[in-house]
């Protein structure tokens, strides 16, 4: 099953609705059976946030691991995967394997080494009985063998101006702290082609600046961070 979520005018509501739908799918699946979801899209569009929100809603710990940490050889990947899957099963944790593109890409006859890695990865996840999220930065050229092992695929489109506006609002309003940032400032910020992770980090750094100055968060703090990160002011 494949989904492509629409961005809700209310960013928080959209995320809550999506998480509730995922929880319903998980609860309706067979007890004791594994459930694997693929979250695909550019960095910073909400893939990790989705897994974090589902884990929070289900009140289960979330174990996050980058696929690159599994190793490079077949032996390393097999041993690392066995350990991670055993650990998450003991903890009753949800597993998030980040950036799995190297395993998800279609195999070719010219790369025997990589074919072995993919085969091991497929075999290990096939017998997993927990909830697993796989993330990918692209959706094309998947190995056909994954179609029968991935139960749900969600593709996240790149953020547009309206989506970025709500992301800015969401992170700036976290904690309901005092701010001098106005709607026209938010609209100007939304025109910058930044992803959700970049926006989150910019706001976090700006909050540290205003905390040091003991003043409300203002556009000047955001501009200062942008100047350092991008070399230019708005």
Identify the function of each model-found stretch.
Residues 2-188:
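Walker A/P-loop NTP-binding motif of AAA+ ATPase domains
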Residues 64, 77-78, 168-169, 204, ...:
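Surface-exposed beta-strand edges and their flanking turn/coil or helix-capping segments
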Residues 154, 176-227:
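Conserved AAA+ ATPase small/helical "lid" subdomain
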